[in-house]
Amino acid sequence: MDGADEFSLKRLDVRKAFDRAAWDYDAAAVLQREVSERLLERLELTTVTPLRVLDVGCGTGRPTRQLLERYPGAQLLGVDLAPNMLKVAGRRPWYAPWQKRAAFVCADAAALPFAEMSFDILYASLVLQWCEDLDATLLEWRRLLKPHGLLLFSTLGPDTLKELRAAWSEVDGYNHVNRFLDMHDIGDALIRAGFVEPVMDVEKMTLIYGDVRDLMRDLKRIGAHNVTAGRGRGLTGRKRLGALSQAYERWRRDGRLPASYEVVYGTAWAPKFMPTAALHRGER
């Protein structure tokens, strides 16, 4: 298996991975929380007063709550592919008082069960990297936005986990790290989907670990371990983990191992006027 097929994401595998991670997710999702916070800060640069907001990939509901607080006059819908994530979100103490303004729906980010032009803001933090068809996903998101609605998203760029990818390449021929898209490719896809005025920037972030096992454990706890079709089957044995640890040692500095993340932040707008027929044809 090679080429694009090697990196084909299996939606059922993605769902299972995040379902398993749901109960421990908040304790391990350090990077996810930080990225979401920084993405939310970008809303301060806009003057949108939304009536309806969609939080795609809401996970355990943390960003949904923050959006509710930011927009007290808005209705919020949180969507996630993993049912267990939504179970955790629905049990949050903060959720009960806000049930009239918020709801959670289990659905795929690329095939959402809502009418076109339903939302003023679509918020999606660290979701796009799990969507197999970028063009179809962005077209779906644009379909859901009202004229001049705002898309606000973050995702991961190709330098994410570059140390882990390089270390695994010395151990075997399997793909162990998901492929991440370049910022410019995402920008081109936004234009193809009919969005206007896309703005993106990149930020490099680094998490520090004592050893490779800690890194692998964290990735599993947040559901972000490899789910591509080209991954090696079976358990990652002690011998292979030992070889991985040895290969990773070249990056050790001051007794610690880095795990690099390239975070892409983006905003884009739905056109002020969009004929209904064009939404279905994917035209601008």
Feature annotation, model-predicted:
Residues 30-51, 66:
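Conserved alpha-helix/loop element of class I SAM-dependent methyltransferases that forms part
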